[in-house]
Amino acid sequence: MRSVLACERELAELRFTWRLIETTAKMVCPAEAKTILPAMASTREAFGRLETELVRALAAENVNKVVLQMRARAQAVVDVVVRNLYERTADVGFLATDDDIRGFLRANANGRERLEARLHEYIRKYSVYDAIFVLDLRGEVRAAIGVSPESTAGDPSLLERALAAPGYVEHFGRCALLPERERALVYARRIDDTDGRALGVLCLSFRFDDEMAGIFRTFRRPRDRAVMLLLDADGHVIASSDPDHVPLGRTPEGATGADGALIDFGGREYIACTCEATGYQGYAGPGWRGHVMVPAESAFREEAVALQGAGARSSGLNCSELATIEAQAGAIKDALNRVVWNGQVMAGGRRGDSLKLKSMLQQISETGERMRAVFSRALAALSDTIMSSTLQDLQFVSRLMMDVMDRNLYERANDCRWWALAPALREALASGRGGSSLGTFLDDINRLYTVYDRLFVYGADGRIVASSSLSGAADDTIGRQVDGRAVDAVNRLASTQSYAVSPFEASPLHRDAPTYIYHAAIRAPGDDTRVVGGIGIVFESAREFRAMLSELLPARDGVWAAFCERDGRVVASTRQDLEPGSRLDLGELAAGLDAGASRHALIDFDGVRHMAGVALSAGYREYKTTGDYRNDLVAVVALALPEASAAARDTDAGLGEIEGGVRPGEGEEFAVFRLDDRHLAVSAGQVLEAADIDRVRRIGSGEGLVAGVLPLDDAGGLEHVPVVNLRVFFDLPRADGRGHVVVTHSARGRLGLLVDDLISVTECGPNDIRPVPEMVAGRFRWLDRLIITGRDRPLVSALDLDALYDMLRDQVRGELSDADCMLQDEVLSA
């Protein structure tokens, strides 16, 4: 953490400088410095506390950033696998009810070649499988695809488990069906006849190694030194993004939690993060875990994250720790301003040791400027770390959302093509039959595949002849004409591998809501060149897409996500006001993105500044990667930046200097302060001190003209000095910051002035001071003189404290004299 170490060194040097100034002041001008040394000591102690807190926060945020990125990847590795395997449990269950497979086993006759041709079509569509086996009750292989024809040996153990299980069996390890492999992931399911009698077992071999290689490619980052692993329930590595580094079968020590831990592996230290599977649709997975390891020496390598300058920080972040540190830094700045300002007031118009004090005050001021610069850089680094971490998290989640969507729609393309090959559909359309039997067939599928609102079948002319009825109105659907564009596309499909997808638009087949409808051609039995109709499957897009977004959305307030087309047309969103079909102004967010690419950026949505991550669809396997179909969708994940809090103040704004044009000791000194955008002043001789606002005790709400009273000890005892809110007097809006109290005295009495900031104590000559123009003197009774500070410098208004006191007394009608009676125990808060 080079940036943290550099900050720590700078802060240590400042701490030494503070002590040196204090020691020098005690030696050079002990009497004059005595009044400010306690405040200096208090400020130094606060600086020390903040130094510790700031370094700790910087280190913690850097660690948090690394762990957050590791956790996201570890979680994604296992969750993407589990989501995929959930689909496999559904596949084996559905295919085990296939009439062709049942008929083949029931007949116990020849027909293997025909069945294997059908299974070959299945594996061409569902390319996540590399082998399919149909076993009889003796365990013999009756049909197989993806292995050598001579392979007839079954797997007795797998057969026994599948025949006894009420559902699917998930097997990972050695399998007699695939003897050449060290391990295989196989899904098995008993094949039952329509009367419930067992006929055999169906086994699907999942392309596990190929799938994991694809997942690792998706989540690998440029210049990546992290190793992504998949661990089994016993902690053994079953997949590795770098098997030369972390081979299969190893057991990383300390792979126990998602919060990150330091572990030893192969003689090196790593930061490691392990995540359990979230589960999907009630399926918990095989008990596997995602694990990510990053070498400790490279984990905190600085990464350039474009934050687009001041615009990134001006809005602040909703981080309580950062706000607290900024507030503490602001309080130290205020305290330092008061030390210097009070010292300047005390040293004003004096000679001798007081000139030495002025020199010391100059050193304090310069050191304070250094301190503010260091804190400003450190706070900017802390803010940038938090922001870059958030931006990278949003980008990663957008990529994950897009990957999940692509994988989901890959299944939709497979389903429509496979169901189009159903013999019942081919024979019915070729013979011109429709009717209730086809509707029942479609209902049976729809009950198992609830991601679809409706399945329908139509002839070559586009007229619907059958529809599932689970969503209602099947009778109204039959006879309806399918969109001509879809019919033309289906009639032109070249092979059983081809499919067509409607644009995302409203459809009467989906309650007039926008959706995608996947189409495949139904071909004549025995003649794949003749199209006799088509099947359309209506995706339940609003529900399913919103579920994808919601399940993957980061758990933090203000985050939202959307799937959009490149032009910003919304497909789905987690925001209620972004309905499907509406528009989201993406600006240049997705411009120039290639397939599978992602980025993060700061962008305005609806006039509100957001951090956002965006990813463009990459497709999955052959889906959208082979020229079969193009639909450039993007996933957007965004977090609104809150308005800067009162604590998020500009720590770069140091103690300003307003210089008068006179040699020291020859002019009149003024104590200058700021109120909103105005510079005001009082004669330095009329200033007792600048006090911390926390010393003020409220009167009423503390927000009126009289803010409260300031207890002040002097030789005469305790006095409560009324404190006036000058913003209320000048009809200015309430300030966000804390402010200071300038305690003054005049012939009328003592008065505290609540101001925004302290500027300086400056000496002005006769040429710098102007009388109030007669035209405005009557209107502005509180204005005593005008101070000219030079070209392009602010005009300073010197206050007439006696006139101001009289005006205030008239306005509050006795509140000043009765202030002690209205005293409350509360402390004024800004």
Give, region by region, the residue ranges found by the protein language model.
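Extracytoplasmic/periplasmic ligand-binding sensor regions of membrane-associated signaling proteins
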Residues: E116-A117, E121-S205, D210-A213, D259-C273, ...
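The feature marks the first
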Residues: E657-G702
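DNA polymerase processivity clamps
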Residues: E669, R698, G704-A707, P722-R750
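Mixed-charge, glycine-accented linear interaction segment located at domain edges/termini
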Residues: I769-R770, E774-A830
